[in-house]
Amino acid sequence: MIFDRRRYRKDNYTYLLAEGADAALVDPGDPEIALALAAAHGVRPRFVLHTHGHADHTGGTARVKVALGATVLGHAADAGWFAPDEDVAGRAELALGALRVGVVPVPGHTPGSVVYLWRGRALTGDTLFWGGAGNCRHGGDPERLARSLTGPVAALDGALEVHPGHDYAELNLPFGLGLEPGNARSAARLAAVRAAKAAGQEPAPSTLEEERAVNPFLRSHVPTVRDAVRVRAPEASGDAVSVVVALRRLRDGV
């Protein structure tokens, strides 16, 4: 079993999943980085998975497909950005040779956003970040994002590791602390992220349980978050979806 990631474009991530000779690249936005990642592990991925269609995640797909002869999978709702060979819509699990990858639709950041589940990990694309959630400026819908975060994402196992499409932790965590200045776990996570950066290391992945303790977008039901949001956005009602929509608007204004 192989699981690895590489950073590109400053804060994007591409991922490699492999079971024996069967391998997949996830979001190969930079083809050279993605192909080098596969080569470093001595595998030839036959599959490319997309969490959503934005170009910073799909821009390397054409070259990777040609280089590897790979099959491209993604949600057809995002086909305006890229052309999947296979649509993952309506499929709870993908059988990719020996790889078994769960599929959770999470529309919002884009209409076709999905989370992939594999061996205790959630590859969340731009739906859920460490300490934050994706914006909806480029074809997204804040209410659909809110319903995804309070519905299918909230239902996922808390033990899952979170592997997002970008590392925005050092930007997101202070926003959450501004809403909950007494959140000791959020402060500790920010300190750990900054320490890793100072040491030239990648941040350790969080778990969904940890995100539920530090990420305001997963804490819309918590009174301290709800009240802090309503002070800043009085138009927000008390329900969780309304709070997440207001959070997205507040975060966009930072």
Indicate where each model-derived feature is located.
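Active-site HxH/HxHxD metal-binding segment of metal-dependent hydrolases
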Residues: 9-10, 23, 30-103, 188, ...
